[in-house]
Amino acid sequence: MTSLTVDVAIVGAGPGGSTLAALLARRGYSVALIDRDDFPRDKLCGEFLSYDAMPIAEALGIDLGGAPYIGHCRVVGRGRTYAFDFPHPARGVSRVFLDDALHRCAVAAGVQAVTAMATAVSRDGVTLENGIVRARVVAGAWGRWGRFDQQLERAFVRDRSHRNFGFKRHYRGEGTNGVIELYSFANGYLGVSDVEGGITNICGLVHARRLQGHKGKWDSFVEEIRAEEKPLEAMYARYEPAQDGFLSSEPVIFRSRSAVEEGIFMIGDASGVIDPLTGNGMAMALQSALVAAPFIAEALNDGDRKRSEDGYRNRHAELFNHRIAWSRRVAFLLSRPALLDAALRLRFRAAGPFFLRKTRADRDAIARMVAG
């Protein structure tokens, strides 16, 4: 039976949850980091860590030495391609590695890791299947979809017309050699990039309407899109699976979310989901933790909870809402192969830099936030 009383309880030990835990523990607060899984563990993800997350990873002392550098993006259409450079290198890093590294970082900072299934949350604590964690502040880092979203009656869970599903598998092959590739198919898209250990991650997103008749059979769905799109057939032919089967996601719904729900501070995907094509999801998870930490500290120190909640809600919207909106515009294009090809024929060279400005934070601004 677990019974704890702490300053902060965090539900979910992904990149956002572990980062927030480490930041708060370094400020001297007692923190419980709750996750049902043991580490290391795998998760569905594009496994692309954008350059605007690097100041946070570096400040936490995360060693990314084995993660390949990614300095370029290539958008592959039916008849044309478009390539552009990143202003700073990103890294290809698996969730197996990154989640474990951040979790270890949090524990090293003094965080109490709790491996248990959480069954209920409130602003005052977390009920576990085998106990309870009482806390002055609770943070939700359970990802893009969880039982607690339904418990809290968040509006997006009722949306059945905009549901997407992710799928991912690791492969071995020639690799992408410092490039992330983006491919289009009807009602979806996928990204291809290398991670550590000579592995290439192929991860996609598809609208639920495309999955009718497949019933979770991702092999048959991939065969279908390979038959539809020659670039996909050529790409998949270069690789052999490196793991058994696919990982897939719960519904991915791109609807607005509040960064605070019933007094619970939300971070990472629980606070807002950016389209995976941007490669900014993990960066946003780390950045939302960086933004939330001082407001949670303020709530703990000053006791003016409403001011802290409103401050975080406003700062979160300022930093992330425009990115999420722009990601949906680009996803509309990328999930329509004919429209993408028409756009590629325009040869708009500034499209890549424009896309990066609209879907990322300024790296130097994040570095200044880290420096405090």
Write out the residue ranges for each language-model feature.
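Beta1/beta-strand and adjacent pyrophosphate-binding region of the FAD-binding site
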Residues: T2-G14
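Glycine-rich FAD pyrophosphate-binding loop
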Residues: A25-C45
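A conserved beta-strand/loop capping segment in the N-terminal third of enzymes
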Residues: A53-A101
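FAD/FMN-dependent oxidoreductases across multiple families
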Residues: Q212-A292
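C-terminal helical "tail/cap" subdomain of flavin- and related membrane-associated enzymes
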Residues: P294-G372
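Predominantly flavin-linked oxidoreductase catalytic cores and closely associated redox partners
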Residues: C105-M235
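N-terminal Rossmann-fold NAD(P) dinucleotide-binding loop
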Residues: G17-S18
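Conserved N-terminal glycine-rich FAD pyrophosphate-binding loop of Rossmann-like flavoproteins
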Residues: D38-E58
